C-alpha cells in the first residue's frame, strides 16, 4: 500500500443548526505553502492528481469513540480535462447528531472509492473497494466567529491500482527474459 501525497481538507465555515453542523467539504487547489499544504489526491506520491467523475470522496464523521458515518452524498472528482486535477467538486455537508456546543470534538476522515465498481460507499466498504482513506483526525467545534482554515485533514493513505497495460508489459518482458535465457542455454 503506497501513501498518497498528504491531502488536506478545508473544513471551515461551520454553522450551528440545533444538533447539526454544516461543513464546507472541499480540497481547494491552493498553492503549496506552509499555510496551505498540498491538498490534492494523487494516484502515487508525487504523481498527477486523480481525475474522473467515477471517483468519489466521502466525508466520514463521528463523536470520539463512535462509529464513522458518511455525511450525505459523496463528492465527485473533476473531469479528466480539468485544470485542477486531484480535487473534487465539494460543497456543504451536514453532520447530524454531534451536538452544537463549542468545544465538542468530532472525529473525521475522508475515503475515496470508484462508482464504476461500487455504486455506493456502503457497497465499496462491503466489497473492499475503498481506494484510500485519510488519517482519522479530531476537529473541535470552535467558538464563533470561525476561522476560514478551521481544521486540516492530513496523511491520505491509499494504494495505486496499476493499469492493465503495465501488467501486460511486465508479463511480455518476463517472457522475453525467459526465452532469452532458454536460448543461451541451448
Show the residue positions of the predicted features.
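Short, intrinsically disordered, low-complexity terminal segments
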Residues: 10-12, 173
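Positively charged n-region of N-terminal signal peptides that target proteins for export
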Residues: 1-4, 163, 180-186
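A short, hydrophobic C-terminal helix/tail in secreted or cell-surface proteins
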Residues: 163-180
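Sec/Tat signal peptide C-region and signal peptidase I cleavage site
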Residues: 5, 12-18
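Mature extracellular "passenger" or substrate-interacting domains of secreted, surface-exposed proteins
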Residues: 18-161
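Intrinsically disordered, low-complexity segments enriched in proline/serine/threonine
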Residues: 8, 39, 164-166
Amino acid at each position: 500500500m503506497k501513501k498518497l501525497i498528504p491531502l488536506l481538507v478545508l473544513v471551515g465555515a461551520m454553522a450551528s443548526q440545533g444538533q447539526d453542523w454544516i461543513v464546507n467539504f472541499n480540497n481547494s487547489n491552493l498553492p503549496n505553502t506552509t499555510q496551505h499544504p498540498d491538498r490534492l489526491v494523487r494516484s502515487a506520491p508525487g504523481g498527477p492528481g486523480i481525475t474522473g467523475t467515477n471517483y468519489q470522496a466521502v466525508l466520514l464523521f463521528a463523536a470520539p469513540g463512535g462509529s464513522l458515518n458518511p455525511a450525505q452524498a459523496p463528492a465527485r472528482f473533476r473531469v479528466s480535462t480539468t485544470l485542477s486535477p486531484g480535487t473534487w467538486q465539494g460543497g456543504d455537508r451536514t453532520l447530524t447528531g454531534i451536538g452544537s456546543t463549542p468545544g465538542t470534538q468530532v472525529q473525521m476522515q475522508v475515503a475515496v472509492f470508484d462508482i464504476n465498481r461500487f455504486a455506493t460507499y456502503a457497497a465499496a466498504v462491503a466489497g473492499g473497494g475503498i481506494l484510500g482513506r485519510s488519517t482519522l483526525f479530531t476537529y473541535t467545534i470552535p467558538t464563533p466567529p470561525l476561522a476560514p482554515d478551521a481544521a486540516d485533514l492530513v496523511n491520505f493513505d491509499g494504494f495505486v491500482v496499476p493499469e492493465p497495460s503495465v501488467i501486460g508489459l511486465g508479463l511480455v518482458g518476463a517472457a522475453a527474459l525467459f526465452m532469452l535465457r532458454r536460448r543461451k542455454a541451448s
